[in-house]
Regions:
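Positively charged n-region of N-terminal signal peptides that target proteins for export
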Residues: 1-5
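Local sequence-structure signature of Cys/Sec-based thiol-disulfide redox active-site neighborhoods
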Residues: 40-47, 55
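N-terminal "domain-start" segment that seeds a small globular fold
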Residues: 17-37
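Aromatic-flanked redox-active Cys/Sec active sites in thiol-based oxidoreductases
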Residues: 47-52, 81
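Hydrophobic h-region of N-terminal signal peptides that target proteins for export
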Residues: 8-18
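Structural microenvironment flanking redox-active thiols in thiol-disulfide oxidoreductases
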Residues: 55-112
Length: 112
């Protein structure tokens, strides 16, 4: 019985170890399913963004970084989140419109 439990525990542990952060799927705002594997060999900056946050002007700085370093392998991924004080209540379409019209954002935004 102990051997059976040991084998079960090792099997469960092995399956947990097989999942690496770059294999976890996520969606972009346009609904495309991807993972960090798509950005292999690049420097990825993951940023929590919100359009009603005191740090919202960071979009401008992020876009400057994006334009300056995208050609050198930098990828900025904006992750809109409404979990911190309800500062991102909009839909994906509203968030994208806000980013592009107010800050001329071109870096990828992920699904909220």
């Amino acid at each position: 019985m102990k051997n059976l439990l040991l084998v079960a525990a090792l099997t469960a542990t092995a399956s947990l170890c097989a999942a690496t952060p770059d294999s976890i799927p996520f969606k972009t705002m346009d609904g495309t399913e991807t993972s960090l594997k798509a950005y292999a060999g690049k420097v990825v900056l993951i940023v929590n963004v919100a359009s009603r946050c005191g740090n919202t002007p960071q979009y401008a700085g992020l876009e400057i970084l994006n334009k300056k370093f995208a050609g050198e392998g930098l990828v900025i991924l904006g992750i809109p989140c409404n979990d911190f004080g309800g500062q991102e209540p909009g839909t994906n379409a509203e968030i994208k419109e806000f980013c592009t019209s107010k800050y001329a954002g071109t870096f990828p935004l992920l699904d909220k």
